[in-house]
Amino acid sequence: MATKLIVIAFLCAALIAVVQSAPQYAQGEEPTYDEDDDEPIKPHSSADPDASYEEFDPSQLTEYANTAQDPGRRPHFLEQANSNNGDQLPSQSDSSSESTEH
């Protein structure tokens, strides 16, 4: 009985899949498409293609920006930070002795 229900459910699912994949127009009828050839083509970029490169000022690239230091690019910054933190934090031997006393 259970196998019959499984087979019927599978056949219903297959029928639904076939019906949904069928074209949505009758046989012999040609599908119609929107004729939008008269619309102008829009560029993908928002940049003005008529703008010249002379407006670009390369001296702006050398101006300093007030941003945080990147430790990944400045390993000496990491060394300085580690030496400063080492003075403030207790050593590992101190923390291990404290945990055994409790």
From Swiss-Prot:
Purpose: Salivary protein with anticoagulant activity that inhibits host thrombin (F2).
Protein name per UniProt: Salivary thrombin inhibitor anophelin
Bias type Polar residues, positions: 59-69, 80-90
Pfam family, any one: Anophelin
Major site of localization recorded for this protein: secreted
Region Blocks active site cleft of host thrombin in a reverse direction compared to substrates, residue ranges: 70-73
Sequence similarity: Belongs to the anophelin family.
GO cellular component: extracellular region
Secretion signal, residue range per the UniProt entry: 1-21
Key words, A-Z: Secreted, Signal
Subcellular location: Secreted
Biased composition (Low complexity): 91-102
Ranges for region Disordered: 25-102
Organism: Anopheles funestus (African malaria mosquito)
Subunit field text: Interacts with human F2 (thrombin); the interaction results in thrombin inhibition.
Record-linked InterPro entries: Thrombin_inhibitor_anophelin
